[in-house]
Amino acid sequence: MIQHIRNFSIIAHIDHGKSTLADRIIQFCGGLSDREMEDQVLDSMDLERERGITIKAQTAALHYQAKDGKNYLLNLIDTPGHVDFSYEVSRSLSACEGALLVVDASQGVEAQTVANCYTAIEQGVEVIPVLNKIDLPAADPDRVIAEVEDIIGIEAKGALRISAKTGEGVDQVLEMIVAQIPPPEGDVDAPLKALIIDSWFDSYVGVVMLVRVVDGVLRPGNKILLMSSKANYLCEEVGVFQPKAVSHKSLSAGEVGFIISGIKDLKSAKVGDTVTLADRPAGEPLAGFKEIKPQVFAGLYPVESNQYDALRAALEKLQLNDASLHFEPETSQALGFGFRCGFLGLLHLDIVQERLEREYDMDLITTAPTVVYQVVLRDGKITEIENPSRLPDLSSIEEIREPIITATILVPEEYVGTVMTLCTGKRGIQKNMQYMGRQVMLVYEMPLNEVVMDFFDRLKSVSRGYASLDYEFKEFRAADLVKLDILINSDRVDALSLIVHRASSQHRGRELAQKMRELIPRQMFDIAVQAAIGAHIVARENVKALRKNVLAKCYGGDITRKRKLLEKQKAGKKRMKRVGNVEIPQAAFLAILQVDGK
């Protein structure tokens, strides 16, 4: 039986047609009836459908009768394409022996295509190149085949030419999967070993674990042991997704399916853990995945302070399905009680915020995203700081190190100049530049905090949307960094603090103060907005008070009478300023992102 199993995933850049091809394959194999079929059938979240992106990996077990007359079981594992979710891709690939590399025949190879393909090759997966969208008038398959060979370096002469939209060539893809992807290796009689690829929480049955069985057989009623936590559970149900969940009598070596065993806490079923039988455990656990560390941090605060507990509950529920989301409570003088949350990137932050607002009906204030800095103190201690307002006193700091990433940018040659200017402006150091057909591959080392700000949007705008970016963390490196504070009426607003490079700090301070002046609504008293580095004020702007014309009722009359009224108004404003609070709108917290550190 194991000879007739094929485990494969589909890897591609965003918008190259992964989910559409998955739909066609499911339809072709009869996984869903025409009535149940809908676009992006594996994208189960509404958010995934609306944005046209895949966030969570999904699976489908399909039966296919090949032209040689044999019946095959195809396990399709769908993967995300966005750089923020690249860890999901490596998890999906670890359960496969093969991968379809889908490339848009009009767009050509893009940065995530390269990154995901290298991940597949590193994991020893058989890669089958597929050119999609050949029905488009702009399709140029010959150029794209040359690009695949030049940039990625895999043989692509015999690449399949298909159109997932119309279904043309899908049957050839299935035949290619059967012919080229090797069957899984595994021993049905050995002790059970199953790798947890994903786990999520279901309110009816508890935690559902998606596993790839490597050796052995698992049946409902078996006692299972999770090897990292040494916890025992009773296996209640096993089965596969076709894409709807279907219960089976057993899961055996080579198969991909789900296990339900009444686990209440997602932390117990860690992704990358090995499941084995309690009464006949495996000797060694399988090689898991490296822990994913959040790259970007932001504060999430409820607009109403009585919503704090509801926000905690909502974050805990989201964390059940998204192990890469980290959060811890924090307080801010300006915003009250909230949470410091860690994300994989800006898209991840955006999606979490939108899910909180949409699914849990929360009203949130989000502070500008920051990255983790390493601070070396004079006594030799090293601490990691993800909130700029927690930076220790400058006199006790030896050096501040910022995270550096290696960014790979693929861009058509006519936009190379503007992209290089942008990277240099973001303190990038060029490491490599290769011409590949009509595209150029640029490799830069850049500080992550420059990328987090607005790099992605600016890259798209200077290249008219053609450039694509992939990055990975390299190291922490010492830099000349300072903390920029914003003072409103001489009070520091901790949520507006940020860490910037000294060279651009004055400019950033001036721009930020100007931006604040525009965004803070006028009150009945003057508001002073100042930008400060330590005790040194680098910029000041005033938000002028709204004032009533107190002289309106004086027709002519004595100047002293007018002066008395004006003095009285001035004294009232002064008193008001002493007790008055300034409401800072949400837009002001995100203004940091729009300020350009030139």
From Swiss-Prot:
Provide the reaction this enzyme catalyses: GTP + H2O = GDP + phosphate + H(+)
E.C. designation(s): 3.6.5.n1
List this protein's GO terms for biological process.
positive regulation of translation
* Any Gene Ontology CC annotation: plasma membrane
Alphabetized, the UniProt keywords read:
Cell inner membrane, Cell membrane, GTP-binding, Hydrolase, Membrane, Nucleotide-binding, Protein biosynthesis
Question: What superkingdom does the record give?
Answer: Bacteria
List, for all copies, the residue spans of the domain called tr-type G: 3-185
Localization, UniProt: Cell inner membrane
Please list the GO terms describing molecular function: GTP binding; GTPase activity; guanosine tetraphosphate binding; ribosome binding; translation elongation factor activity
NCBIfam families assigned to the protein according to its UniProt record, in alphabetical order? lepA, small_GTP
Note the HAMAP family from the entry. Answer: LepA (MF_00071)
Q: Which family does it belong to?
A: Belongs to the TRAFAC class translation factor GTPase superfamily. Classic translation factor GTPase family. LepA subfamily.
Q: What is this protein called?
A: Elongation factor 4
Q: Upper taxonomic classification of the species?
A: Bacteria, Pseudomonadati, Pseudomonadota, Betaproteobacteria, Nitrosomonadales
Q: Tell me what gene encodes this.
A: lepA
